[in-house]
Amino acid sequence: MKSGLKIGVLAVQGAFIEHKRMLESLGCECVELRQKSDICDIDALVLPGGESTVQGKLLRGLDMFDALKEKIANGLPVLATCAGLILLASHISNDDNVYFGTLPVTVKRNAYGRQLGSFEATARFDNSFDFTMTFIRAPYVEAIDD
């Protein structure tokens, strides 16, 4: 069953394929956003995890940055994970960069340690199935801005 939504998944770097696969399994039409022309008629946006500095540079280099920022500022629904949160934040406490700046929060990059400290673990919930969890360096929200 199709949802009728066309969701753009930023696909210039990072963990975009997992988001795309899950959304497609739910019946959503997904578009990998790789160039400015891909942005035109999306109904929602996913900004995946990855490296926010690289994503920001690629968005500018591919001339996608301003078009995405305008759509977000005009109310485009966004799901942002990890690097996506950093791209949206209005302030980054441990970085001089600000990207879209459309979400009024202050975030801290790599707040949970270094990449080398990332790991996977398995847990069992309600004695029903094993669930693999991935723990990574990630940002956290330090403050909600005015």
Outline where the language-model segments fall.
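Structural signal for conserved beta-strand scaffold positions within catalytic alpha/beta enzyme cores
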Residues: V9, E32, A80, G101-P104, ...
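Flexible, glycine-rich phosphate/dinucleotide-binding loops
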Residues: F16, I39, L87, N94, ...
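Cysteine-nucleophile active-site neighborhood
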Residues: E51-A123
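Amide-donor transfer/coupling interface in amidating biosynthetic enzymes
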Residues: M1, R109-D146
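N-terminal beta1-alpha1 cap of cysteine-dependent amidohydrolase-like domains
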Residues: M1-N74
